[in-house]
Amino acid sequence: MKRFFLLIVRVFYSSISLIFTLLTAKLLTRDDYKQSVELIVALSIMAPIVSFGIGPLIVRKGKCSTQIAYRRALNGWCLGVLLSLILGLISYWLYPDIYIYIFMLLVLNNTSFIISECYRSQNDFFRALLFSNGSPSSGVISLGIISNFLFLVLCAILFLLKIKITFSFLVWGTICSILITVLYDFYKNFIRFRLRITNKWLYIYSKSGFNISLIYFLFSFISNSDILIISHLADQNIVYDYSLAFKLSASCLIIHTFFASMSQVEFVKNNFLINLAIKKLYFTSISVSLLVIIALNIVGVYVLHFFGVYPHNEHVFRWVILIKSLGAIFYIALGFNASFLLITNRFKNIIISCLVFVILFISVACLSYVCGVGGWHSILYSWLMSYLVYSLLLFLYFKRKGNYNG
């Protein structure tokens, strides 16, 4: 029953991302919509810098009292708020109209992720997965999914009734709907602990957290590298079509994170070995993801039409969602067990795979441009080729060095 509930939460999160995108596409001009895409990309890339590995640091310190674990978490949260403030000021220079949204959402992401990892340190995986899927780079994923989903559905109804709503209302409503779900847990768990940041703690924290932070930053860059470049180089119509396809194709990966998270729990319980339960979750993940991908490629554009959103160029939309879907299913098929590399502390292997992606992506994009394949085509094809190599490397690393028997 708990697993089913968590799966529903993942479906809600996928719906939230889609509804938010569709509402902004209807509310904003193409130029403003392009800026909103830049906001989402900026959040995705900055979030792991803020989290800075605090969660895994808490878990990997071994058995300790709840008081010590939560004091460490409070230290990390305060440091995360400071980093959010610094990034918020940088965002003001880059995005003067939306920097306050970036700051608030970074703090929320930091809060929900740290609460999640505190529960994880107590082996309360159900609550941990409610507050986060274990990845600080995935934006604000928390128990606020349900309240945020209800808020966005309300916004959609208001829009259909032709009641005027604004982008600011949409973002602040999202922030508040998530905030109400994390305030109580934060107050309950952290208010009685004192902040105690020392030079020794900062050294240990930085040494332990840097690798995790770098990995999640690279994960985020890999997921958003194409839309990051497209949003700054392409014209607003291409950004419009590309981002719509990007959001739709991401649905299968969001569902996949549920099965991957459940598998990590089984992996730890089974002394870091692949058992039958993990294999079942693996095949279920592939099956569900494949069905979602097929459905998205067939009816994706009609889903947009149903909500009154029409791509500027339907050919661009369909081609992007097809290529992104191919990359997603390849990663799910090969990279599913590779997620265990994080648990087994194989940081070096993960970082090498990520850096190979970055180098290959930049190299292929430049080569495509030299060969005359310019614009969004070269970025999309470069991403796909690099993503396939990246997924294959993760698979080979785990099969060669991990406890892999299937």
Spans of features found by a protein language model:
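Short membrane-interface helical motifs at transmembrane helix boundaries
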Residues: T24, L82-I102, L291-H312
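Alpha-helical transmembrane segments of multi-pass membrane proteins
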Residues: L43-I49, I86-L89, Y95-Y119, W172-I180, ...
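Membrane-interface junctions at transmembrane-helix termini in multi-pass inner-membrane proteins
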Residues: R60-K61, N110-S142, K269, L326-L355
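Signature of the first transmembrane helix
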Residues: M1-G55, S84, F210-N237, I293, ...
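Helix-loop junctions and terminal segments of transmembrane helices
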Residues: P48-T66, S249-L273, L342-I343
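Membrane-interface helix-loop junctions in multi-pass transport and translocation proteins
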Residues: A25-Q35, I90-Y101, F126-L129, N133-T181, ...
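Transmembrane helix-bundle signature of multi-pass secondary active exporters and lipid flippases
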Residues: I40-P48, F219, Y242-S261, V292, ...
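Interhelical loop/hinge segments that connect adjacent transmembrane helices in multipass membrane
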Residues: I100, L129-S142, I163-S223, K269-L276, ...
